[in-house]
Amino acid sequence: PWTENTASVHFQQLCEIKIQKTNHYQQNTELIKRGCVWKDRLSTQNLQEILTQNPDAPLESVARNRQCVIVNTAQPLRLEVLNILKPWGHEGWYTGVEKRGVVKATDGYGKTELPYALTLFKKQLLADYSTALILLKTLNPVAEDVVGDLYYEMHEEKWEVYVVTEIDKGAWPSGTGIIKAGLHPDKIAEYQQNHAEKWPEVLLKDFKQAITEYENVRRQIDEPTTDISTELSAQELSLRKKATEFVGDCSVKVGDIVSFPVFQLHSLQHGIKVIEFQTPHYERLIVMFSQKVLTQKHWDTADALSKMHPEVYHQPELEKLYQSAGILVERFVDFPQFTADRISLDTGQTWDDQLGRQYHLLISISGQAAVFPENGQAVILNPEEALFLPVGMGSYRLISTADTPLIYLKAMPK
C-alpha cells in the first residue's frame, strides 16, 4: 500500500522462538524471537531442502538463501540509507516508506524492506506504535547558491527538527550559514511602526503580493520555450530578493539545532547539511521556490500565508538531562509526538539506556559506538549509520570506542 500499487504481493515468513534462561538458577526465562520474511513463495519441498542444508541453523540457512535480514527482538536492526535525488541535492532516508522509495534493513544475510521486517513480532518490535516510524533522514543541499536552496515551505501536520552536521566553506567561508525561517524582525518592526495593531494583516498582504510578482517571472523562466534574456534574469533576481527579505535569517554553525513546529515558514539553504527527525507526514505547503517545482503544478502561497504564525523564529532551548566527566545528554526537542536527545561521550565512556515501551532510533554524527543489547550481540555504529532498537531489547549499553569523542542522536516516540 505504501507504493500505491494495488497489485497483491505474496510473501512468506519463517519464525523461531527459543526459551532463554536469564539467571544461574534458571528460575526466570524469556522468549527470544527471531525470524525472516521474503517476497514470493517457496514450495514446501524447496523450503525443506534449504532447512536440511544446515539443520543446526535453519533460520540462517533460509535467510542466506533468500538474502533477507534476520529480525531479532533482542537485537538492533541496521537501517540502510536510501538516497533520493532532489532539485537542490539529495535526501538520505533511513526510515522513509512511500511511493518515492522504501528503505531497507540490512545485515550479513541480506536486505529486507522495512515494512516487511516490522511485520514480524510487531508487539516486541514496536509495542503499540505504528509501523510508520519517526522519519529519520539527512538533507544534503549542493553548495551552489540558489540551486541548493530548498523550498520556502510550511507544514500543517509535520513537526521536524534539524541538527546541523556540516557547512560547506565554499558556500559559507566563515563557517556560519543561514537558514531562512519566520518573519524578518526588521520587517515586523517596520510594519508595526507604520500600521500599529494591523501590522500582521498588512505585512502578509504585501508579502503575498511580492511572492505573486516573483512567481509570475519564475513561471516565465520555467517554460521550456522561454528565451531567458539578461533583463528577465535581472528581474527574477530583484523580485526574489524582494520576496525573501520578508523572511528571517537564522544563523547556524555545525552542531546547532533548529526545530519547526507546524505553521512555521522555513527554508534550508545551500551548503548546509543536516540530520532531520520528523513526524511521519508527507505534506507541505510550498510558499515559493527559486527553481521549477517538479512535484506539483502550483504554489500554495495564499493558503500557507493565511495559516502561518506571523512571528520571528527562535531556535529551541536545549534541556540538559545529565552531565558528568566526559558525558553530556541533552534533549533538543520535545514535540507532542516524539522526543530527541543528543548524547556526547568522550573516548571510553559508557551510557546505559532503557527502552521501556518505546522503540529508539539512533544515528551517529561523529566517533564510533559499540552498542551492547541486554541479551544480544554488540553492534558497531559509525558516523551517519542508523539503528532501530526494538522494544524487546529492554536495555542496552553504549560505549565510545574511537579516538575521537562520540556524538549520536536518539529519537523515541511518546
Predicted regions, residues:
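Double-stranded beta-helix
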Residues: 218-219, 225-242, 275-316, 402-414
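Short acidic-glycine-tyrosine-enriched beta hairpin
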Residues: 247-259, 373-393
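Short beta-strand segments in beta-sandwich/barrel cores
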Residues: 350-351, 366-372
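Residue-level marker of beta-strand positions
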Residues: 16, 49, 257, 263-265, ...
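His/acidic/aromatic-lined binding-pocket segments of jelly-roll/cupin-type domains
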Residues: 152-155, 160-163, 249-250, 257-258, ...
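C-terminal amphipathic alpha-helical segment
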Residues: 283-356
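Ligand-binding loop in jelly-roll beta-barrel domains
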Residues: 157, 167-170, 264-283, 378, ...
